[in-house]
Swiss-Prot record:
This is Leukocyte elastase inhibitor B. Monomer. Interacts (via C-terminus) with CASP1 and CASP4 (via CARD domain); these interactions regulate the activity of inflammatory caspases. SUPFAM superfamilies: Serpins (SSF56574). Keywords: Cytoplasm, Protease inhibitor, Serine protease inhibitor. Its main location: cytoplasm. Belongs to the serpin family. Ov-serpin subfamily. GO terms for molecular function: serine-type endopeptidase inhibitor activity. Residues 352-382 are annotated as: CARD-binding motif (CBM). GO terms for biological process: negative regulation of interleukin-1 beta production; regulation of protein catabolic process. It comes from Mus musculus (Mouse). InterPro entries: Serpin_CS, Serpin_dom, Serpin_fam, Serpin_sf, Serpin_sf_1, Serpin_sf_2. One of its GO terms (cellular component) is cytoplasm. The lineage of its organism: Eukaryota, Metazoa, Chordata, Craniata, Vertebrata. It is found in: Cytoplasm. Expressed in brain with lower expression in lung, spleen and testis.
Amino acid sequence: MEQLSSANTLFTLELFHTLKESSPTGNIFFSPFSISSSLAMVFLGAKGSTAAQLSKTLHFDSVEDIHSCFQSLTAEVSKLGASHTLKLANRLYGEKTYNFLPEFLASTQKMYSADLAAVDFQHASEDARKEINQWVKGQTEGKIPELLAKGVVDSMTKLVLVNAIYFKGIWEEQFMTRETINAPFRLNKKDTKTVKMMYQKKKFPFGYISDLKCKVLEMPYQGGELSMVILLPEDIEDESTGLKKIEEQLTLGKLHEWTKHENLRNIDVHVKLPRFKMEESYILNSNLCCLGVQDLFSSGKADLSGMSGSRDLFVSKIVHKSFVDVNEQGTEAAAATGGIIQVLCEKMPTPQEVFTVDHPFLFFIRHNPTANMIFFGRVCSP
């Protein structure tokens, strides 16, 4: 499980770097867990260099028995009885006249609980698209109403792999609505906008990364299994969002070091955090190509013969949509996918800290028992 957690975190950071290249100062929000689960289902049917590229990019080559690990991780992350709702769902939509290998269908069912729904892409692709969107909408409590835009599937489509994830968590320490006020949020050194700024003073795990002049705050959700971790520079020091230095330093080792419990102190913190809501949509083909997955998208090169026995399948698009809403009560989020470690240098202990999120920040929602990042985001304009 630890190997898979490290593999997923590495992939998260690498994917984030490709997303910020096309959006240097924009908001970013995605579910790495959803994307890697979806690609793991593709990997199940991939062979040759297609499989090798997927394995290398997703760092599956460092994980023993990858599909069993995903099976255990999914069961652990979405187990019932928790005080939050975290729902994961996988489904395959296949052209009804196409012969998929029974072994492939049995494996996706066993490892990913993904059923095959037979649809008529050939003669009724628009109906199939609507059916897929309707299913995703239901799985994400209506937050992702249209995963697939018109024209994304057509009569040539053979297979659509869908992964949907929905999360709703209540803060362990909720903000009081009466404390929320209008306040300025600095987008960069020059521009500001007015946001709804929430406030509370409670004990939270807090840390400080001195060489980056960056504060770290962990805000647990009820039950403690999931937390939101926020990385906030003390100030905007570059000519952009103020996040450049942190983003350049983001590595698996450093992120683990900065945010692990032993390096955070539980102290009184005055937290000011804006309410924010984001909806993002990505077609990930070019991002994954940049990271080394190339054959998968090419009709002449893709080898998905583990799915069908022949080499006529390829992936035309990987679509990912995500939604997050952070407010006084907690967080609602959904998504669907079609170096040298430096120890924290603590500041002199003070009885309380101020954590005012009035400029761009990074955050992620982590499943603590498995150390897996379920969602990752950058807020430049709440």
